[in-house]
């Protein structure tokens, strides 16, 4: 849809195009606008530049989802519409109900609403908080961010979550990548070669030189880059991805003048990505990764949304355009990575810009608690983090060596002395199809430890399709009874339709008859089920009957402080 304006005083005006996109198999609508400025033709007076001070790319008047007679805080979750755009930053573990690029407003023309104050927020507006203050010259165009509107079919939390997860798989299919990641805490070439060999032996798939490892992705020295280029080649020859870490925000830039010039920045300090330092920083990262042939990039502290009031930075003119410029710079880096097949680990919601994975429920102090507490917290974080994310969109954390504290009680090293705990962490994570940053000096320290790692890696890879499928929430971990989840894949052409994992935090055996919601597997009438034990062996199959709701009643038996699982087949 185009909006064209007649020339004024012989000078052509920009054209505004409105684009809509719909998608197969999911009720999602995408909308964006583009401002196109025709090229000045020969003999025509030079046209001026125009500034897109601000824009509203969408405005919807919604049916109020609830009647509020008196004032109270509005609950976004009651809407039957979910909105997200790719203009988002500053949200680590989940997407906030309202972003920097959209908001709900009061509709002043709605005078008959139930609320006495007439302040029911029922008009959705897609517009940036700042700017964008972008100038368009002849022959150029301006493209807004993309707004995505997902229409729910009901109020059930699980169904809404399934819709969200399908949306991400459709709009950002790279989020389905789910490699096994070893966070190496040293960057010495000799120990990295040992890590390559350990990953090759156990089946781990990527090595990230972690924070605190001593690796410097900002180095411009050719000799230094050559070292890691050779290591990346060796990793690739072993079938592994290889890359490193860099911190963007929550640090000082090269000079104080290169920091964001604003009051109360999110991390108290941080570089402006439109400053000279910020521009050189991103260029250096790209040069290093491309030269060395890296295939994974961990970017801590992506652009968090701070405006910058400096009028001296080369990348922006002032405060009004600073947010747009910095967001574009960060998103362009991830798109550049995506174009080259570089996997991006980033603790922020940059999925629609090319990011692969963010935190599932990451809090540093949690991984300094005693090991037994970490086991429960881990399952709680996975349960909570997979309502709106697929399992592959979130990473967890396993402190093989000490992290922020806690000493020997919080760490797994020496690994051979804590095999039961190491096994339990793999059961939590790979039983949920969730990858963690296994951070430490090594993956195994004995043949017994190596056997535990290989057992779980082989299990995950042998059942990868169903373990990476949608996760249905059964019972949240509370340390008082069983907890667990159910993976489901209703595809007609697959044999494994479901895989359920159950965990027992108690010191006594748990035996329960539970209702298993096999409706989500696409099966009707009956299902073939096989029991799995802690050695990951399967029993002979038995048949379970499904009622009209698609529910099967199944007895589960879980040994003390252990786990069991069920494989559901058609």
Give the predicted meaning of each segment.
Residues 1-121, 130, 525-541:
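Polysaccharide-binding surfaces and accessory modules of carbohydrate-active proteins
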Residues 33, 139, 199, 300, ...:
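Conserved, mostly hydrophobic/aromatic
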Residues 134-153, 559-569:
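Short Pro-Gly-centered flexible turn/kink motifs
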Residues 157-206, 210-213:
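An acidic-aromatic substrate-binding cleft motif
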Residues 187-201, 278-290, 422:
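Short, acidic/polar
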Residues 210-404:
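Aromatic- and carboxylate-enriched substrate-binding clefts and catalytic-loop regions
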Residues 543-570:
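C-terminal beta-strand-rich structural cap/linker in extracellular carbohydrate-active enzymes
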């Amino acid at each position: 849809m185009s909006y064209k304006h007649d020339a004024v005083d012989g000078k052509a005006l920009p054209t505004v195009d409105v684009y809509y996109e719909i998608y197969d198999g999911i009720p999602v609508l995408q909308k964006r606008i583009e401002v196109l400025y025709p090229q000045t033709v020969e003999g025509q007076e030079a046209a001026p530049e125009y500034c897109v001070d601000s824009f509203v790319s969408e405005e919807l008047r919604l049916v109020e989802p609830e009647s509020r007679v008196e004032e109270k805080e509005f609950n976004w979750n009651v809407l039957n519409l979910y909105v997200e755009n790719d203009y988002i930053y500053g949200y680590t573990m989940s997407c906030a109900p309202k972003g920097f690029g959209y908001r709900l407003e009061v509709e002043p023309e709605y005078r008959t609403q139930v609320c006495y104050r007439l302040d029911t927020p029922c008009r959705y507006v897609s517009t940036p908080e700042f700017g964008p203050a972008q100038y368009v010259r002849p022959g150029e165009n301006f493209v807004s961010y993309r707004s995505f509107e997902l229409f729910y079919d009901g109020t059930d939390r699980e169904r809404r979550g399934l819709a969200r997860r399908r949306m991400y798989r459709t709009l950002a299919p790279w989020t389905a990548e789910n490699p096994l990641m070893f966070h190496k805490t040293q960057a010495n070439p000799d120990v990295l070669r040992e890590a390559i060999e350990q990953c090759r032996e156990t089946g781990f798939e990527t090595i990230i030189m972690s924070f605190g490892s001593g690796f410097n992705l900002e180095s411009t020295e050719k000799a230094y880059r050559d070292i890691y280029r050779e290591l990346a080649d060796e990793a690739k020859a072993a079938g592994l991805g290889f890359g490193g870490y860099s911190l963007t925000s929550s640090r000082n830039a090269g000079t104080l003048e290169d920091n964001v010039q604003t009051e109360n920045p999110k991390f108290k300090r941080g570089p402006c990505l439109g400053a000279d330092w910020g521009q050189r920083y991103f260029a250096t990262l790209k040069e290093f990764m491309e030269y060395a042939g890296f295939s994974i990039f961990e970017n801590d502290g992506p652009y968090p949304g701070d405006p910058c009031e400096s009028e001296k930075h080369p990348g922006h003119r002032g405060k009004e355009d600073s947010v747009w410029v910095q967001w574009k710079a960060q998103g362009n880096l991830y798109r550049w990575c995506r174009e080259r097949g570089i996997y991006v680990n980033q603790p922020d919601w940059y999925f629609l810009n090319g990011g692969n994975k963010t935190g599932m429920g990451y809090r540093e102090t949690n991984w300094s608690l005693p090991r037994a507490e970490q086991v429960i917290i881990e399952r709680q974080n996975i349960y909570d983090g997979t309502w709106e994310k697929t399992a592959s969109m979130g990473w967890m954390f396993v402190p093989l060596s000490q992290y922020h504290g806690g000493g020997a009680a919080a760490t797994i090293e020496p690994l051979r002395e804590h095999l039961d705990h190491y096994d339990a962490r793999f059961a939590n994570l790979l039983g949920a199809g969730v990858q963690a940053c296994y951070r430490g000096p090594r993956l195994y320290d004995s043949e017994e430890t190596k056997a535990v790692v290989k057992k779980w890696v082989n299990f995950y890879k042998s059942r990868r399709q169903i373990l990476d499928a949608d996760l249905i929430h059964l019972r949240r971990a509370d340390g008082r009874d069983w907890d667990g989840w159910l993976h489901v894949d209703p595809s007609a052409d697959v044999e494994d339709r479901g895989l359920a994992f159950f965990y027992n935090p108690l010191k006594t055996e748990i035996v329960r008859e539970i209702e298993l919601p096999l409706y989500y597997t696409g099966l009707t009438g009956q299902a073939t089920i096989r029991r799995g034990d802690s050695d990951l062996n399967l029993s002979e199959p038995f048949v379970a009957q499904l009622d009209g709701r698609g529910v099967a009643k199944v007895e589960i038996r879980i040994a003390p402080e252990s786990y069991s699982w069920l494989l559901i087949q058609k």
